[in-house]
């Protein structure tokens, strides 16, 4: 039996998702949260603790993307990218850790990107933020290991999500052709790895970065 909490900046999409998931997994709740805001994270985390009592697993999956030449990125766009993709994980990890340390157990999972590993042209700010998540994961794993807490990172490749809404069918076909396995990934494939890393069988795995990219990054 697991309780599931989902946080999302826009309330309606995840309210709908939570309602659908509730039919399969009782105990799922949706909470609105802007991870770029410490105050919003604190309110959301308090709501989760009130509803569930404790947080055993934290998945830092919030993210935004933007394709733009580096010389055209505004300071505001740079800061927003870091606030959502990196600082959000910082806020939530700081809120989750005291309880995990007290209980001497916990799982923290961050979701980076293959561009956090290799860098992406025209996505320098995105790549920098996602690379920061990898650094956070590795350092935090060393710091929290003695407290029975594991910290791991999943770095997806080209996955069929809303972030690809602007891509044409031709763009997607070209990306699939570049991928050694010959297709794009699915959210379910990423989720199944996260579920494993959150479970008891992954207790000796920490500080690692797992690529889910069909062989694009080897």
Identify the meaning behind each predicted range.
Residues 98, 142-143, 203:
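Alpha-helical segment proximal to the catalytic Tyr-Lys
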Residues 33-43, 75, 188-189:
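The beta1-alpha1 cofactor-binding region of Rossmann-like NAD(H)/NADP(H)-dependent oxidoreductases
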Residues 69-70, 77-82, 164, 171, ...:
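Substrate-binding pocket helix/loop in short-chain dehydrogenase/reductase
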Residues 73, 119-127, 139, 167:
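Active-site loop-to-helix junction immediately N-terminal to the catalytic Tyr of the SDR YXXXK motif
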Residues 113:
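Residue(s) in the substrate-gating loop at a strand-loop-helix junction
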Residues 146, 153, 176-205, 212-214:
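C-terminal helical subdomain
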Residues 64, 71-90, 105, 109, ...:
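Catalytic Tyr-X3-Lys loop
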Residues 93, 129, 137:
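Active-site helix of classical SDR
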